[in-house]
Amino acid sequence: MEETSVAGDPGPDAGTSTAPNAAPEPVARRQRILFVGEAATLAHVVRPFVLARSLDPSRYEVHFACDPRFNKLLGPLPFPHHPIHTVPSEEVLLKIAQGRLFYNTRTLRKYIAADRKILNEIAPDVVVGDNRLSLSVSARLAGIPYIAIANAYWSPQARRRFPLPDVPWTRFFGVRPVSILYRLYRPLIFALYCLPLNWLRRKHGLSSLGWDLCRIFTDGDYTLYADVPELVPTYNLPANHRYLGPVLWSPDVKPPTWWHSLPTDRPIIYATLGSSGGKNLLQVVLNALGRFTRDGDRGHRWPEPPEERAGQRLRRGLPAGRSGCSALRRGALQRRQPDDAAGVGGRGAGDRAPQQHGPALEHGGP
């Protein structure tokens, strides 16, 4: 029997028919996120780079801004890159070693102008910055939510102390007198380092962050710590401060030509100072490792000098892929700053880990 429809009855095929002029469903706009890395050291570039690369491009429109000095290590970028200026790494590290202001008012003023230009051009929904202190001003002036990436060592709620730095004063006056003066004057030294950013914040109508240097390095609408609480414990963290965990990265490079010539019958120690490690520390590290590089039975060192194998970066997992290989690394700049900056820090010892933790220690803070 032929089916018919009556008034008020849509009929069996009505639900599957489409009106020719029906408007298509609106496609959800991708969130636009700008990642900004401060290229004073490699760590502050690769951490936002790794996070940016981890986002689903079908859901997020990602932009990446940094000084291009480390781009050759990053490889092809899967998103637009926007070059911004960062003061030379050597200049920043020298100022830190000398206890001088690493970012003065003039530098931060230039940074803020560059930030505002790129924020206006991209108009992101969120900006994520790693050690780009000027975003504390520029993002707020643009009305854009700001997520700061930092090390938990810098958290105002971190359970840690600031050790005496290895500075020339200790050679002239002795460790004990300088230690006493350091404990007395450290809060004042830290306060001096807060002056440039606080002055610029007030100039732009923003409130001061106070005189705790830890607040300067962790200010953000949200703050993500690239650490785990077991490494740097904290107490009473604000709701907008979270542990992100280690951000792992390594350059995609081939192993050096000598890698497969290393002995397989003895443990291997892979030492890396990171991009912020002082070159003068390399021999200190090698001397300290001397007892590990001796053959216990024959009492001699490995024949090939360690210096001939220095200066090359290894792909993540390569050292750990060798049986009995351990990693020894120097902390990244953010771990050093409370120690070295303002004459407020020391020569940090490396972290030694068993084989399975090698990649994390090697690349958690390049």
Curated annotation (Swiss-Prot):
| Basic and acidic residues composition-biased segments | 295-311
Gene3D superfamilies tied to this protein: Glycogen Phosphorylase B
Cited SUPFAM superfamilies: UDP-Glycosyltransferase/glycogen phosphorylase
Q: Where is the signal peptide?
A: none
| Annotated region described as Disordered, given as residue ranges | 1-23, 295-366
Record family assignment: Belongs to the UDP-glycosyltransferase family.
Q: What is this protein called?
A: Inactive PGL/p-HBAD biosynthesis glycosyltransferase BCG_2979c
The species is Mycobacterium bovis (strain BCG / Pasteur 1173P2)
